[in-house]
A protein has these predicted regions:
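Class I SAM-dependent methyltransferase "Motif I" SAM/SAH-binding loop
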Residues: 50-52
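Short alpha-helix
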Residues: 184-203
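Conserved class I S-adenosyl-L-methionine
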Residues: 1-41, 55, 142-169
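A short SAM/SAH-binding and catalytic strip from SAM-dependent methyltransferases
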Residues: 109-123
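A short acidic, Gly/Pro-enriched loop at the edge of an enzyme's catalytic core
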Residues: 98-110
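A short glycine-rich, Lys/Arg-flanked "PGG" loop and its adjoining helix->strand segment in the class I
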Residues: 125-137
Length: 227
């Protein structure tokens, strides 16, 4: 999946994906970001993993000292630079989320939302352990995935993307709740709350699992410095 997103849905195409969102999907996206902003408000340094064109960073930045976004696609960072041009407290870096070039305990909060745990196509344990490593003791770590309750709206969103020519047609026979398969090779899964809890437990952290808006599932962690 990480390879797919290095070749598809980059820059302006990624922005078009969000332009196609239905009212229910827009509600989901807004509720997810609002929860993030509430949790990181007042933090000095916040990192977003997989920042794309800057959609979440733009909402976070006014409420934090400095917002950092990393992405594996240079095209996304170019779009983000333009999208965030009015903000003076954002730093954008080309970086792999499982090999972060940051010192330990560098950030007050680390954020990975909208199913990045699956969409990045990387080792999930390494993704979580890197997020833990770069977050300071008592700092906040937020990961989110899709709630099963948003499945029907989620798959319809992908159908809309396919109709717009952004992705291949949805393979209806192979797509099941939690997993979307398209005919161009896209295969996108999701993680359950229990999976997120277990991933953080392996890194010595206790995750609070919480559903937001009946659309996203958050793992909310206050970083334990003993791990």
């Amino acid at each position: 999946m990480g390879t797919y997103y290095r070749r598809h849905l980059l820059g302006s195409d990624l922005q078009r994906v969000y332009d196609l969102a239905s009212p229910r999907i827009r509600q989901y996206l807004n509720a997810e970001v609002e929860n993030v902003v509430e949790r990181v408000r007042g933090a000095d340094r916040v990192l977003e993993l997989g920042c794309g064109y800057g959609r979440v960073l733009r909402e976070m930045a006014p409420h934090v000292g400095r917002a950092f976004g990393i992405d594996i696609a240079a095209a996304n960072l170019r779009s983000a630079s333009s999208y965030l041009s009015s903000l003076k407290n954002c730093d954008l870096l080309l970086m792999n989320a499982v090999r972060l070039a940051f010192a330990d305990a560098r950030f007050d909060a680390t954020v990975c939302v909208q199913n990045g745990i699956s969409a990045f196509g990387v080792d999930r344990s390494k993704l979580v352990s890197e997020a833990v490593r770069v977050t300071r003791n008592r700092g906040q770590i937020l990961f989110s995935t899709y709630s099963p309750r948003i499945w029907a709206d989620r798959v319809e969103w992908f159908r809309a993307q396919a109709r717009a020519g952004l992705i291949g047609p949805v393979d209806e026979s192979r797509s099941r709740e939690g997993t979307i398969v398209c005919q161009d090779g896209l295969r996108l899964t999701s993680a359950s709350g229990e999976e997120l809890r277990d991933l953080f437990a392996r890194s010595g952290q206790v995750a609070r699992i919480r559903e937001v808006d009946q659309s996203s599932v958050f793992a909310e962690v206050t970083r334990d410095g003993l791990s």
